[in-house]
């Protein structure tokens, strides 16, 4: 087998009008590997030569750190050895459909915000003979794909598949979101039962740096008493109301997103976690930790991003893969397949998709069950989308 330094690059192979590049970027979520398998199967079935960037967007720039930068993806193992013998880096994907994590990405690549890096990547894309592009990730990867089209040019068909714990793009249910809620709500519910047993107040920090949808849905599903989202901030009057309500109840679970009051916390040394910062705020407002009723800030964990996807995510991955290749075959570009329900799926143009970090009005009654009129009014006036609040 050739060493990594001696593998052929796509540019050294015969040209192919259906050489599609898959780029995986952004934060990890259940379903990255599932989407890779689905795109490999569907692309191969339709006659595409499928490749993946081994480090996401970084692989197309001079800041790449691994070799080879691109790997050919196939379904089974039957042709793998022959391709390796020819010096082609190749990976068989068929049995990875339920794998956690992803083999083809690094941490989100912020260098792509620079136009010079996107231009460099477009030149590498063309040099390697790629003819179609599918980016996979969340809202940051989507923004990168949209921006990159300027350098790639209109002749390159571009698609995007939404994979994210946060589910922060409009008009789609992200692959990974449902699995994340199922796993996260299970942990939250366990803490609620512990709170009930020992008469405690738990402030549980959950994923959500900018988007609070994961924390919101986990909190609602676990029947948390209060959900605090990343874009929330509270005046003293609301904090006093929260502290008084929590002091009155025997036990409670408060779900707080990791991005809560991030800018304020960054100014403190050492920087407290979101749950600890909220605990300190509530303590100043009158909620005291004591031997008869503990008030405990539970730390944040990213392990939910590395759990295996649910089978429902597999179905969505294959449907989205089919839809994106349908679009390419029909001559469309700048499209995102969506799957909202069994009878609600299709394609959206990039122009019709946006990031969304606010609270939908329908969820307002579900944010708390302590009876907090000041909290409800404050959130409704400042943070509910479509009601004068921030998105």
What do these predicted regions represent?
Residues 19-29, 102-108, 131-136, 201-205, ...:
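Short glycine-rich or small-residue beta-strand-to-loop segments that form or flank ligand, phosphate
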Residues 7-72:
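N-terminal phosphate-binding or glycine-rich loops at protein starts, especially the Walker A/P-loop
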Residues 29-39, 60-61, 115-119, 138-146, ...:
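Short glycine/serine/threonine-rich phosphate/pyrophosphate-binding segments
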Residues 50-54, 66, 74, 124, ...:
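Accessory alpha-helical/coil subdomains and C-terminal extensions
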Residues 25-28, 53-59, 108-109, 138-139, ...:
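Short, ordered loop/turn segments at secondary-structure junctions
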Residues 267-391:
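C-terminal non-catalytic interaction/assembly regions of soluble proteins
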Residues 2-14, 65-131, 140-141, 165, ...:
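Glycine-rich oxoanion-binding loops at beta->alpha junctions
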